[in-house]
UniProtKB/Swiss-Prot annotation:
Ranges for domain Glutamine amidotransferase type-1: 299-543
Residues bound to ATP: 19-24, 76
Annotated family: Belongs to the CTP synthase family.
Annotated spans, Amidoligase domain: 1-272
Pfam families membership: CTP_synth_N, GATase
InterPro entries in the cross-refs: Class_I_gatase-like, CTP_synthase, CTP_synthase_N, GATASE, GATase1_CTP_Synthase, P-loop_NTPase
Record-linked PANTHER family: CTP SYNTHASE (PTHR11550), CTP SYNTHASE-RELATED (PTHR11550:SF0)
Official protein name in the record: CTP synthase
Catalytic reaction(s) noted: UTP + L-glutamine + ATP + H2O = CTP + L-glutamate + ADP + phosphate + 2 H(+); L-glutamine + H2O = L-glutamate + NH4(+); UTP + NH4(+) + ATP = CTP + ADP + phosphate + 2 H(+)
Gene name tied to this protein: pyrG
Transmembrane segments: none
Amino acid sequence: MARPKNVKHIFVTGGVISSLGKGILSASLGMLLKSRGLRVAIQKYDPYINVDPGTMSPYQHGEVYVTDDGAETDLDLGHYERFLDESTSQSSNLTMGRVYKSVIDKERRGEYLGGTVQVVPHVIDEIKDRMAELAKNGNLDVLITEIGGTIGDIESLPFLEAMRQMKLEMGERNLLNIHLTFVPYIKAASELKTKPTQHSVKMLLETGIQPDILVCRSEKPLSREIKNKVGHFCNVNDLDVIGLNDCDTIYEVPLMLLKEKLDLRVMKKLGLKKFKEPNLIYWREFCDKVNHPRDGEITIGICGKYTEYPDAYKSIIESFVHAGASNNVRVNIRLLKAEDAEGKTFDFAKELEGVSGILVAPGFGDRGIEGKIQYIRYAREQNIPFFGICLGMQCATIEFARNVCNLQEANSTEFNKRTRYPVIDLMEHQKKVKEKGGTMRLGSYPCILREGSRAYAVYQKFLINERHRHRYEFNNTFRKPFEENGMIFSGTSPNGELVEIVELANHRWFVGVQFHPELKSRVQKVHPLFHGFVEAAKEYSFGKRQMELPVERSAEMPSFMPAESDMGQ
């Protein structure tokens, strides 16, 4: 199999409206090319001025995806990793803020020899250097670059100009542009409208870029007549107009693009020949399990602070898709707003009716903390499968301290610096840190598991590596009273100082982790903790259904009614 002499570049842009799915398109194309034997990497360029998304609100940006090397990046990198089963890195995500920062730093060091620093050429040249960086350092055949934003946005123009110049320098056989547009369906007229796509291509042409391939998102499949019309008015071959209609799950997108022969059109245009046929048997089986689960469905409640915006929990939600397929069930998600549970009259039994497991999600700040703690207490006392991630694990230790260890005023110093029992405290090396951006404990770190624990049972090994994003940790001063009351510290850092995993032995499934397992779950490698949690929730759900059959019933568990002293203020 002959490798291409030069790395081939594919740039993915989007038009008409945002949130069309450029990330899913890029990941799907990358997966198809990889399945043909090509070595593929994907990178994301964001036009905002922030250096990285690490300090951005989840309401504006969604989740922050952390790589092994500690980069805080765009959530689209999660799609890249889940689809390609390849790790990304710091160089996989570039923001305009980082570009400007680099240019200004160079100017301060005198590297421009006293010249007037301008967008053209200095900023554009910096972007071009970064665009080629991954291609130079990686062992690659194809590099896919997703350009964030929508054609017409002012902030995206430098990226587009850099792409235009690169195509001129490299030649059309080494770089192509795939433009993703929207073809709306007008119900009143019962037809698809191509005019928005035509206008989007016109705006792209104004930047000097003629798209090589058009991918058209639509509610309904595109007819041959529609494709011919789009091709005719957008100056592309109708074979290069790819339809991408709505589907039940994002994991069907690669199969739809394969049917539309997008990968073959890309390979032909880039001169890539003699590569194998893709073997997507596993992918088809996975999609079949997602769409037609053998054992029915269960519901998992995700308790969080940002439930109005599900993208804040994107990797967690996708991890449940993977774990559901591996357990032959569909996992339905019920988002639980933590603040709602802080009222004294909150009815947990009603809110959690039909819920077979509770995950308390990551987050920062004191808003909604007492609600999270009450959800954890309910899960612990009612023996409902519980899974806490990062802040969720910290809240679990606070709840355990207050209601089991009788440390009534226990808290985290993040929420109460003068708490009498600081069971969660700022990490020692964080106490002198002043800046917020990029200063947390970030990236992949090793963890040693305790033999005989639930964590060891699901991982089936002693040493694991997981990704982190936190400043606070469990306070080791309180280890003894916790262990005396039944808490197991089943995972720690290799030196034993930092608590990574806590669990309860006398519970159906009660596990809290300081790290972020959702960042390492992939289609072909479901994360063992998510698999185990869904398995426990499935057993709990099916057990409840058996109990509800019309046979002699046992006495029901008493309803949960926390004392006033336990409720948040």
